[in-house]
Amino acid sequence: MAKVAMIVPKEKMLTLAKPMLDSYSNMHVVLLECVEPEDSQLALKIAQDALAQGCELIIARGVQATLIKHHTSVPVVEIQLTAQEVGGELLSMKEQLGLDCPKIGLVALSNMVGDISRLNELFPVELREYYTDDRDTLSSAVDQALADGCQGIIGGHAACKRAQELGLAYHFLPDSSESLRNAMAIASRVCYAMDLK
């Protein structure tokens, strides 16, 4: 059974993940840690320590997943938001704004969101996507969303902080069980393949 480490950026994700772990018999989670997004170097150190102790796969999100991928040789399964999770936030933002078809910007790191290409067809909103590979450019992505006429944004901590400074409506990226479940299912399949070697 492959040894897995899971590093998540929020306590809520840790709480959601714990009861799901027993559902995946192909993987043995040896480390489950919460590391704040601003402390990505700590996430990298934890990942390197886990590797030294025999960890064979890491589950992570956002900038932490990117750092671990670039600075270790371990396979990384990324936790990505699903269309359903983003759709729920779009409807909530639409209700908050009280507009028939608001223009909403999704501001996130490019590896944090799965395929949402058809959400504009499914929801009465105009969704604009602002993805970046660098956490330091999230604030300027919010500035661009405002310049493009977005009436609200959905984003992480840095993006929402900038939206608040600009007086722009905002919602935080959701932390729900669906994206965690998807990542664990992928990790479980990878672990199964590792076990067959």
Predicted regions and their residues:
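Non-catalytic structural scaffold of enzyme domains
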Residues: 1-197
